[in-house]
Swiss-Prot record:
EC number assigned by the record: 5.6.1.7
Name of the protein: 60 kDa heat shock protein, mitochondrial
Enzyme class, spelled out: isomerase
HAMAP family: CH60
Organism: Bos taurus
Amino acid sequence: MLRLPAVLRQMRPVSRALALHLTRAYAKDVKFGADARALMLQGVDLLADAVAVTMGPKGRTVIIEQSWGSPRVTKDGVTVAKSIDLKDKYKNIGAKLVQDVANNTNEEAGDGTTTATVLARSIAKEGFEKISKGANPVEIRRGVMLAVDAVIVELKKQSKPVTTPEEIAQVATISANGDKEIGNIISDAMKKVGRKGVITVKDGKTLNDELEIIEGMKFDRGYISPYFINTSKGQKCEFQDAYVLLSEKKISSVQSIVPALEIANAHRKPLVIIAEDVDGEALSTLVLNRLKVGLQVVAVKAPGFGDNRKNQLKDMAIATGGAVFGEEGLNLNLEDVQPHDLGKVGEVIVTKDDAMLLKGKGDKAQIEKRIQEIIEQLDITTSEYEKEKLNERLAKLSDGVAVLKVGGTSDVEVNEKKDRVTDALNATRAAVEEGIVLGGDCALLRCIPALESITPANEDQKTGIEIIKKTLKIPAMTIAKNAGVEGSLIVEKIMQSSSEVGYDAMLGDFVNMVEKGIIDPTKVVRTALLDAAGVASLLTTAEVVVTEIPKEEKDPGMGGMGGMGGGMGGGMF
């Protein structure tokens, strides 16, 4: 008989040795003060220099090597920032912090990443310089944030709402690097699906850009399991002419889904299951049949929570001509499903993050009735959150989905153009949301006088305000520099001109920016400055930087091979 305590005693030394091995981390390298800041600043400079060349209408492209496929050619600031990974760990920390600025700006505003990057570099550089001369970094940061708050108030005063399709086209054109075709196509898309409608960007199959309006619904829930993927072109599941099973309840048992699968199989149609959740035996069976016999099925979690989920499922049922199982007041069981209970759609696209139901076969009169119900709810609700959700539902039911198909002669060209189209689309949405200000980063220059009215508590806070005053000139100077002219002279001339005059870098002339349609979304400018100041001023307060020292791998040597070679040599001769 095996005695457990004796076995455990024998294993104890092994366990201790193993635990030590598992918990041991890399050794750390620690740098203090000026040494650490100098290295971080080098990383900030490297990243900012790479991103800054893309700025403005005459900015250059950046070619990025990829681990697979062709190199990527882009003018998109956040794409360039994300691609940079430095060997030196201290430099890399500086670069990664500014990378975060670009990412945050991109996520919140969808554009303005290059502006955010050059602003962050300027604040960090000026801050480090002042700290090296004995200034207090915490007070400098307070001064910086005081100045940023004043600039944001001034930007809101300058901001004008976007009202006409022409203004929408102008914003999109500027963000697309002056491409009027992209500007017009985005303006058309917004006109057709509404300002809050769903607009997606895809690869086209022709040389020209195309706009397609598809009647359908998109929601932010992807496939439950990646085993449902049925195409090699991207991680997604695509079906044509499919049935849709909708359930308010969780589906766990196989018996619940077999009748619907049999109906879909009998009619030779794929089946899309949208439920609160699909798990247990039901999910295992679906995945197994998908892999073994190629069953055309995909399971997706229903979007939203509580009443919002119920409403969205009901919208889907009306749009597709189906029924919602588990709905209160309806005595429908999944086991008793009939063909008329299943919704019908012309096309389904499901990725890991979202799903699109396109060309629904629902009754037009029922859809119109549902739209009117939502409009009535909009009129009586006072909650901003409720209004937002109702508008989303309204857009999905009434306007459909606009698909921008980007054309080109090669994958490299299409990908570069897609970056610009996505930027332009995001900028346009931001402009519709918060309005527009002067473009070419002239709006930041016009905010400089507002800093004079701030009363700092001490000299170091005053230094922080001066840093922002100097920093606000940097984006306009960078645009001018990329156009081949002296940035400081251009900025000086803009400051001496009337409030609506700025520099048109494409034409190399001073013009009325509003009349020329050179405008920026207020949200983009505001977010770029706020994110840059927050991270860069925090960077200047760093006194110690800790990094890991990678463990050196021992060279196993080639002794065995050498011996083998010798033996083979002897044999051959």
